Amino acid sequence: MLKKLFLGIIHIYQRYISPMTPPTCRFYPTCSEYTREAIEVYGPFKGGYMGIRRILKCHPLHKGGFDPVPLKKDKHRH
């Protein structure tokens, strides 16, 4: 339920708010897309935390660049 709420908020932002502002994200994928993917993979708490950390890095003093969501490690592989 919380996952759907967070993803819904991100969807509204991406669909209605982001198009009205100039592109300023220093990363690829964008911070909102990164957060959406992180929540999809890691759930609302860890994924949300990862998204917040990413957003806090998105400022003019950080070089930015390609920064995808890390793959989830398989705990059963040796």
UniProtKB/Swiss-Prot annotation:
Main localization (coarse): membrane
One protein family per Pfam: YidD
Domain of life of the source: Bacteria
Annotated membrane topology: Peripheral membrane protein
SMART domains according to UniProt: Haemolytic
Protein localization: Cell membrane
Keywords: Cell membrane, Membrane
Keyword set includes Cell membrane: yes
Family to which the UniProt record says this protein belongs: Belongs to the UPF0161 family.
Record-given protein name: Putative membrane protein insertion efficiency factor
Organism the protein comes from: Staphylococcus haemolyticus (strain JCSC1435)
